[in-house]
Amino acid sequence: MKQIRNGIYPTMITPFTDDNHVDYAAIEQLVEYYAANGCDGIFALCLSSEIFHLSDKEMQQMMNFIAKKNNGRMSLVASGHTSLNVDAQIEQLKAMCDNGAE
C-alpha cells in the first residue's frame, strides 16, 4: 500500500446527469477544481459519493476516470465497498486500487 500524503482531502460527490447517469464532464471539473485549489488528495467513491446508487462496474469506471484526469497530482482514496460479504469487499477494494485508488 502506498503512503498517503498529509493534507486536505475533500469528499467528492458523484454528479449525475438528468437521466441518472454518472456525469463525467462534471467529475472532470471537480478534479480540476480540487487540483487548482491546492488539495493534497481526493476522497473519491465513499458514502458521500452515492456509492450505494452505483454498480461495481460504475464505481470502477469512475475511479479509473478520476485517476486518469488526476494524472498523479493528488492522492486518491476510496472506500467503494458495498458488499455485505468480507471476501467480496476485499475484491471491491482491490478493484478500486487496480483503477487508481491508493
Give the residues covered by each predicted segment.
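Active-site beta->alpha loop and helix N-cap motifs at the rims of alpha/beta catalytic domains
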Residues: 2-102
